């Protein structure tokens, strides 16, 4: 997966062959969290990503959208409450191409990065709440004199 996320998608015209079942199986080993599915006779890879908060899913979908624009390879993105489902396939060949697995790897990387950012933000917020709990403000807040109101 590490090498896939560093690759760039190549332009894909209708004369490029779909991946064979053996090629799909080999690439799928690099993206084990992704499910290979067939929808309306077209193979695709899909994964549902979970989030603690709805806005984090929106951020993720936006980041994947930007990656898709940069690579000129676009997924189907379904945003649900605290979940985002991505479906990758190559429309011009009505099936799977290496580009789909490249974008799966890039999507996974974007997800892990967002989880790290969210975790770091939560740690800072928890530390702040421990230092100044909302129910126990510092004594100087609300004091009318220069002394602590304790």
At which residue positions do the language-model features occur?
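A charge-rich, low-complexity, intrinsically flexible signal that marks solvent-exposed coils, linkers
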Residues: 40, 113-150
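Long, contiguous binding/interaction regions
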Residues: 1-119
């Amino acid at each position: 997966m590490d090498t896939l996320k560093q690759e760039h998608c190549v332009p894909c015209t209708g004369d490029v062959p779909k991946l064979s079942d053996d090629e799909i199986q080999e690439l799928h080993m690099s993206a084990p969290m992704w499910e290979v599915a067939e929808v309306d006779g077209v193979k695709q890879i899909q994964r549902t990503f979970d989030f603690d908060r709805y806005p984090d899913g929106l951020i993720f979908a936006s980041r994947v959208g930007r990656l898709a624009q940069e690579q000129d390879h676009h997924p189907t993105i379904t945003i649900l409450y605290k979940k985002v489902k991505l479906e990758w396939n190559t429309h011009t060949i009505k099936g799977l191409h290496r580009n789909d697995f490249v974008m799966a790897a890039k999507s996974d990387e974007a997800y892990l990065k967002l989880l790290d950012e969210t975790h770091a933000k939560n740690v800072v917020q928890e530390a702040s709440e421990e230092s100044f709990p909302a129910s126990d403000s510092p004594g100087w807040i609300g004091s009318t004199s220069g002394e602590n109101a304790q």
